[in-house]
Amino acid sequence: PETLFHGMMPFLHDSPPNPRLLVNPGTISMRVSPELANIRPVILGAVVRGVDIDEEVIKRLMEHQEKLHFALGRGRKRASIGVHDLATISPPFRVEAVDRNHSFIPLAMEDEMTIDEILAEHPKGVDYAHLLDGMDKVPIIFDSKDAVLSFPPIINGDHTTVTTKTRDIFIDVTGLDIRACESALMLICLQLSVLGGKIESVRVNTCEGKEWTLIGSPIEHKVERSLVEGILGNPFTDDQI
């Protein structure tokens, strides 16, 4: 509802369109191993600070996340999102390719499980194991203390869960499609900014050796008139367009 509210404001209240997302420069970095190039090459991140979170906000955030997994992520293949309580983790972060015998405590579990056990026994692992078929190594996001934040695109670590006490959030988005990943990250950040959060960039050193940071500037897209008229259900003159 937050992103819908943002989009409808110019129509309902005659306010000027504001497609720009204010992104403040941050100090957190994330380094991606070159090994990820053939596993899950797109890995992005951002921080949102000062969010006032209650149970309803958590519910809406999780619902939004799953809708993006379905629509933009194509079942988490093109893009998947991880949301973490920043207070429980220690930057800088790094993303490594690990063997399937690596173990950690996944979300909603009490004991450590290996990667193979998660893929065979954890509900999310069973649902999405096919995305890692044929891969000897899988991606893991670590913090500076070697704690596991996430095993994308499957499951987060148990200790990073967002709760009503959370105020600062780290978001990771990983996948195969840069446009889908950037769009998913922008939409989650937009939702949290409407709730009062302040967005900060994360400096990502990609698997290709390049540097990426979130930029909140709008992107222009050219569309055919027929598409606009088809969506809105009316023909338009040149002046109206």
What are the functions of these language-model segments?
Residues 1-241:
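RNA/tRNA-interacting regions in translation and RNA-turnover enzymes
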